[in-house]
């Protein structure tokens, strides 16, 4: 229980730095079409309501909103559209902005739920997401495929911006996160494999994590990470192979996709 309390305290310490912000001069600018609506700004999304965003965090919150608040309107933007350059974020009735670090607190207000999912979310954020970034951008063959088949599907100039200097930026980010000067690719992939094994064991034969009757945020987050892994155009796809060994996780992914009504991931038709 002490560990869960620490996770909860950690989330509160982060949230306290990023309160809900009301701007006297709203940013982005007011739009008459959405003046009374809540708008979620996504990145790497083609604006098709049945299509998945091609960014893990955008897909995660896009899916959560589709399942829990269908009234939310989605718009595609670049990271620079956000005051803190982190997407997604939401704008409420053209005035109040809820920035990315505050989304979890905004949508999940139940303390017990946060405590329950925190240790498992950390596996996805720290182990799996790190391995995704490494696989996409720091494997030369994979990055070549990403440049040809993934980034071009993004709007100009975002596709150009994303492809220039991105590997070195990602490497610095991961080194800083892991507090390492060099990266051990095999160790990072092994950590992701262990994370999937732990999540698979947690799910067991249940339909949703914690035997809930409907998808929790952990289910949605697992879905988002798994979808990106499954649809990335990679030559070296060890991460996809590892994920595929856990049938209960892939089945959960299919269930969430069906509930959310997705038929494509960017230009990729889903079957």
From Swiss-Prot:
Belongs to the metaxin family. One of its GO terms (biological process) is mitochondrion organization. InterPro entries: Glutathione-S-Trfase_C_sf, Metaxin_GST, Mito_Protein_Transport_Metaxin, Thioredoxin-like_fold. Keywords: Membrane, Mitochondrion, Mitochondrion outer membrane, Protein transport, Transport. The lineage of its organism: Eukaryota, Fungi, Dikarya, Ascomycota, Taphrinomycotina. Involved in transport of proteins into the mitochondrion. It comes from Schizosaccharomyces pombe (strain 972 / ATCC 24843). It is found in: Mitochondrion outer membrane. This is Metaxin-1. Pfam families: GST_C_6 (PF17171), GST_N_4 (PF17172).
């Amino acid at each position: 229980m002490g560990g869960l309390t620490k996770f909860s305290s950690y989330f509160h310490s982060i949230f306290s730095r990023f309160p809900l912000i009301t701007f006297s001069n709203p940013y982005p600018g007011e739009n008459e079409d959405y003046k009374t609506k809540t708008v979620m700004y996504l990145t790497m999304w083609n604006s098709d309501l049945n299509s998945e965003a091609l960014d893990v965090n955008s897909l995660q919150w896009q899916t959560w909103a589709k399942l829990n608040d269908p009234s939310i309107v989605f718009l595609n933007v670049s990271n620079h559209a956000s005051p803190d350059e982190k997407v997604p974020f939401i704008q409420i009735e053209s005035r109040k902005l809820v920035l990315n670090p505050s989304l979890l607190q905004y949508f999940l207000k139940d303390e017990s739920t946060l405590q329950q999912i925190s240790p498992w979310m950390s596996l996805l954020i720290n182990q799996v997401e790190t391995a995704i970034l490494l696989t996409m951008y720091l494997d030369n063959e994979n990055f070549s495929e990403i440049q040809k088949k993934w980034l071009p599907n993004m709007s100009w100039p975002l596709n150009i911006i994303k492809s220039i200097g991105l590997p070195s930026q990602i490497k610095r980010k991961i080194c800083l996160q892991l507090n390492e000067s060099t990266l051990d690719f095999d160790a990072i992939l092994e950590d992701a494999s262990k994370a999937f094994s732990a999540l698979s064991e947690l799910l067991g034969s249940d339909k949703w994590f914690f035997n809930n009757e409907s998808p929790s945020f952990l289910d949605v987050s697992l879905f988002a990470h798994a979808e990106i892994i499954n649809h990335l155009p990679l030559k070296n796809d060890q991460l996809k192979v590892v994920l595929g060994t856990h049938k209960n996780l892939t089945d959960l992914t299919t269930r969430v996709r069906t509930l959310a009504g997705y038929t494509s991931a960017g230009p990729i038709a889903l079957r």
